[in-house]
Amino acid sequence: MFGSSNPFGQSSGTSPFGSQSLFGQTSNTSSNNPFAPATPFGTSAPFAAQSGSSIFGSTSTGVFGAPQTSSPFASTPTFGASSSPAFGNSTPAFGASPASSPFGGSSGFGQKPLGFSTPQSNPFGNSTQQSQPAFGNTSFGSSTPFGATNTPAFGAPSTPSFGATSTPSFGASSTPAFGATNTPAFGASNSPSFGATNTPAFGASPTPAFGSTGTTFGNTGFGSGGAFGASNTPAFGASGTPAFGASGTPAFGASSTPAFGASSTPAFGASSTPAFGGSSTPSFGASNTSSFSFGSSPAFGQSTSAFGSSAFGSTPSPFGGAQASTPTFGGSGFGQSTFGGQQGGSRAVPYAPTVEADTGTGTQPAGKLESISAMPAYKEKNYEELRWEDYQRGDKGGPLPAGQSPGNAGFGISPSQPNPFSPSPAFGQTSANPTNPFSSSTSTNPFAPQTPTIASSSFGTATSNFGSSPFGVTSSSNLFGSGSSTTTSVFGSSSAFGTTTPSPLFGSSSTPGFGSSSSIFGSAPGQGATPAFGNSQPSTLFNSTPSTGQTGSAFGQTGSAFGQFGQSSAPAFGQNSIFNKPSTGFGNMFSSSSTLTTSSSSPFGQTMPAGVTPFQSAQPGQASNGFGFNNFGQNQAANTTGNAGGLGIFGQGNFGQSPAPLNSVVLQPVAVTNPFGTLPAMPQISINQGGNSPSIQYGISSMPVVDKPAPVRISSLLTSRHLLHRRVRLPARKYRPGENGPKVPFFTDDEESSSTPKADALFIPRENPRALVIRPVQQWSSRDKSILPKEQRPTAPLHDNGKSPDMATDAANHDRNGNGELGATGERIHTSVNANQKPNGTTRSDQASEKERPYKTLSGHRAGEAAIVYEHGADIEALMPKLRQSDYFTEPRIQELAAKERADPGYCRRVRDFVVGRHGYGSIKFMGETDVRRLDLESLVQFNTREVIVYMDESKKPAVGQGLNKPAEVTLLNIKCIDKKTGKQFTEGERVEKYKMMLKKKAEAQGAEFVSFDPVKGEWKFRVEHFSSYKLGDEDEEDGV
C-alpha cells in the first residue's frame, strides 16, 4: 500500500505496515510488520476476534475482527484478550465470546449486547464469513473493490489498481459507480456499493448496507457478507445477535435492519427508531431495550427513556435525530406537554424580538420585528388569539405564581423543543430547531445553548451552564472536541426570563473561565450584553471586575453582586458614610453619602445617586444583580424616600418595573419595557410630584396610561372672580300671564352668558378676597318694572363727612319682578333710610351719578359678617362689551379693556378711537371717546360682504352723537377693480381711476366722505357723521366701471 509495489489494496508479499494484506487481509507473519513487536497489542486474536489473530489484519482472510493466526501488531492477546483478560473478559479479545462480559454477555463490547444472552463470537463481524477480506473481497480492492462487482479495485472491474483499467473506476460507465445501474459502484443497484441495493443507498429498504449486499466496501469483508453493515451478515459489529448495537441487515441509515451499530436488540442506549434516515430499526445506539438511560429503554437521548427524552416529553430519535414533537428537559416536564398538556397563551415562549430576514446589509445588523406575532412560536396567531388563550388559562396579567417561570418550559425552554441530548443528528448534522439540553442549536436550552458547528457531537455543544462555558471551559466546549458556537445557556441565555440579549445570568459574558472568561464566578458582561436578570451594571456575582476595565476589590468595587454595602465609586475602605465621614468597606449600609458628586451602591448592588440610602432607588439604568437587582432588566428612576419604588426584596423594581418619579404618593406601576414579560403583582407605591394615577397592565396589548395631573390649588389672589358669581343663579320665576306688565324672557342675557374667564382674570389680584360678591342691580334692569316701597329701599352708609353715596334708581332698587314676587336678591334687602346715617343727618340725592357710588351695603346678615362689596372689582366683566363671535374683534381687545378698567375705573366710559371689525370684511373706528360699557356689539354692528350696518333696528338707534351713532371711519375690504369677463384685477390705469371716481360718488350719495381707496389691497375708507347702512352693491360697480 503505502510504499509497496502493489496498487492500493492489491496483494503483495510484503507490506510496509506489517502484513501482506491490507486492512483486515491475509498476512504471513508478524515479521513483515515494521511497527509490530513480537507480541501483538494484547493477544494473538484480532480486535474482538475469536482466536489469537491480527487485530487490524490477520493471516487468513478474516474481516475486521475475524479470527486470525497472527496479528500485525502482536502475537499474543489483543486488547483485552485471553490470557490476561482485558476490559472485563476472560480469554476472548475485546468482545470475544467464551468468557463473560461485564456488559451483560460473554462478549466484550457488543458481542452479547448489553444484557442479551445470544452468544456471538465476533463483535465487529461474523465468524461465518471469515474467509472474506475486510474492505473488499480478498484485499482492499482485490476481488471486489470499493463499489465494483467481482474483482476490481475502488470501483474497477477485474484486478485493477486504485480505480483502474478495464471496468470503470469510481462510478464509471460499464460498471457504474456512485449509484449507477448495472454493476454500479458506490451505492448502485444490482450489486450495490456504499449503502446501495436494488432500493436506494442512503437509507435504502430491503437489505441495505453501508455499502450494499454482495459487493465492495464491506461486501464480504469488514465483518459481514454485506457491505458496511449490510444485510446477511451485518457490518461493523452487526450479526444475528447484534454487535455494537447492530442487527441483521440494514445499512448506514437503512430501513429494515439498522446499520452502524443498530439492532433489534439494542446496544449502547439504542431504541426502536431507525438510523440516520433509516426506517424501522434504529442506528447508532438505537434499540428497544433500555441500556444507558435515565428512563425506561431508549437510546442516549431516545424516545422512551433517555434523560429528558420521553420521561420529559421527547419523541424517539436516533443518536442525533432531532424529533421536534415533544419538548425536552423542561419543555414538557416543567409545565408543558407531558405534565399537563400543551400550554398556549402569550407566556408559552418568552418574548424576544424577531430578526427580520434579508434586512442586514454589510455592517448594519438585521432589523428586528417588535411583535409577538412575528415570533416563530406565535406566527400562526394574532394578538387577540393569544389574549384569548391567556384568558382560557386564567392568565389576566400580573406575575406568575411563585416558582413558575415565564415560559411553559422548565428553565425558559420553548415548549416545542425536541430531544434532550442531541438537537442535531449524531455526526454533526443539523436538524430543524433542535433545542437540546446537552447539545442545543438555536433555541434556549438550559444545558447547552446554541447551534453546534459541523462535527460537533451529541455530548458537546457551544457553551455551557453558568456563563458561557461549563466552569471555565473554553467556548469550544464540545465533549468530543468538535467546535461549536459561543452563545450562552440557560442561566445566561437570551430567553429564559424574557431577556433578549445573549448574556448570562450573573453578569458574565461569553468568554469562559474564572478570570478572562464568562462564568458564574467571574467576569462582567460584554458590551451590549444584558444579563438574564437584568443587571445593567457590569457587576458580577463574586466581585469580578467589569469588562470595561473597572477595578476594585471585594469591598470597594462599584455594583458587585452582594453589594458593597453603600459604597460609592471611591476606594474600598474610605468612602463617605451616612455622616459624611470615611467608613470601612461595609459603611453606609443604611444610608449613602450625602455628597452631590459621587454615586454610591446600595447594600445589595444597586448604584444610587448621592444622598440616597441603599434601600432607596438607584439612578435610572443603574440596576444591579444580587438581592437588589431590578429583576428583569428595567431601569429604575430615583426616589427620595421609601424603597426603590418596587416591591422587590431590598429595593429592586418588581418584575421589571421602574419606580415612579419624585414626590407624590400615588399607586403607579410604570411601563414594562418588555411588553410580554412579567407584570407587577400590584401597583407600586412611590413618591411623585404630579398626581399620576395608576396604569394597570393586563394582557398583551396593555399599555401604560398616565392621566392628567391632579389640579394644583391656586392662590386666592389669582382666582378669577367671575367664577364665583357665575355660580350664583336666580331661581326660576313663575310666569303668570294674567297679570299686567310686559312679558320678560325666562333667562336674561347675563344668565345665559358664558362663564369663560377673561384673559386678565388670572393676572389681576382680588381687591378683597373675603368680600361678598354679587351682581349689580343694573344687570336685571329689564325686570325693574315696579319700584320697591320706600321702606324697602336699601340705603348706603354715610361717609365720615355725613354724605351718603349715590343710590341711583336703577342701581339701588332690587325691585319686584313682573308678577310681584321679590327677586332672590331683593328679598334679603331690609334696610331703612336712616339706618346708617351719621349724626349730621345729611344724605345725597338718589340721582347722583354711578361714578360717585363706590359702595353699597346689604343688611340682613348676622352681626360681624362682611357686607360691603367693592362694586368696581366685582363687576368688571359686566361692564365689558359683549362680542362672542370669533371672527369679530375690537381694539383695544376686551381683555385689555378689563385690565384698564381695573387699573383706571371708568376707563370704559371714555375709550378713545374704539374699533370694531370683522376679519376679512372691514372695520369701524369710532372717532373720539366712546362709552363701551355693556354694549352688545354683536347685535349693534354687523359686517357683510362689502357692507357694514350699525343699528340695524332703527327704532333702537340713539340720537346722533350718543352710543355708536357717532362720527366714525369705515374701512370696507374686498373692494377691487376686477374685469368680470376675465377675472383680472386692475391695480392701476384708467379703469382704476374710473373705479375710484365711482367710489367717491357712492360715498357722497350715502352722506359719507371719501377718504381713500387702495386698489392693491382692495380697501375703501370713508368717514360718516352718523350710522345706518353703508354698502357698495354690484350694480354700483357696473355703473361706475
Swiss-Prot record:
Sequence repeat placement: 2-3, 8-9, 17-18, 23-24, 41-42, 56-57, 64-65, 79-80, 87-88, 94-95, 103-104, 109-110, 124-125, 135-136, 140-141, 146-147, 154-155, 162-163, 170-171, 178-179, 186-187, 194-195, 202-203, 210-211, 217-218, 222-223, 228-229, 236-237, 244-245, 252-253, 260-261, 268-269, 276-277, 284-285, 294-295, 300-301, 307-308, 312-313, 319-320, 329-330, 334-335, 339-340, 411-412, 427-428, 459-460, 466-467, 471-472, 480-481, 491-492, 497-498, 506-507, 514-515, 521-522, 533-534, 555-556, 562-563, 565-566, 573-574, 586-587, 604-605, 627-628, 632-633, 650-651, 655-656, 676-677
Entries under PROSITE patterns matching the protein: NUP_C
SUPFAM superfamilies: C-terminal autoproteolytic domain of nucleoporin nup98 (SSF82215)
Keyword Protein transport annotated: yes
Biased amino acid composition, Basic and acidic residues: 782-793
Cellular component, GO, one term: nuclear membrane
Ranges for domain Peptidase S59: 885-1027
Bias type Polar residues, positions: 1-34, 117-171, 533-560, 831-846
A GO MF label: structural constituent of nuclear pore
Domain of life: Eukaryota
Keyword entries, A-Z: mRNA transport, Nuclear pore complex, Nucleus, Protein transport, Repeat, Translocation, Transport
Cell location: Nucleus, Nuclear pore complex
Keyword set includes Transport: yes
Region (Disordered): 1-44, 98-171, 315-347, 392-447, 517-560, 734-860
GO biological process, one term: mRNA export from nucleus
Bias-annotated ranges (Low complexity): 430-447, 517-526
Pfam families: Nucleoporin2 (PF04096)
Subunit description: Part of the nuclear pore complex (NPC). The NPC has an eight-fold symmetrical structure comprising a central transport channel and two rings, the cytoplasmic and nuclear rings, to which eight filaments are attached. The cytoplasmic filaments have loose ends, while the nuclear filaments are joined in a distal ring, forming a nuclear basket. NPCs are highly dynamic in configuration and composition, and can be devided in 3 subcomplexes, the NUP62 subcomplex, the NUP107-160 subcomplex and the NUP93 subcomplex, containing approximately 30 different nucleoporin proteins.
Similarity annotation: Belongs to the nucleoporin GLFG family.
Note: Unlike in mammals and yeast, NUP96 and NUP98 are not translated as a polyprotein.
Domain comment as written in the entry: Contains FG repeats mediating the translocation through the NPC by interacting with transport factors.
Name listed for the protein in its UniProt record: Nuclear pore complex protein NUP98A
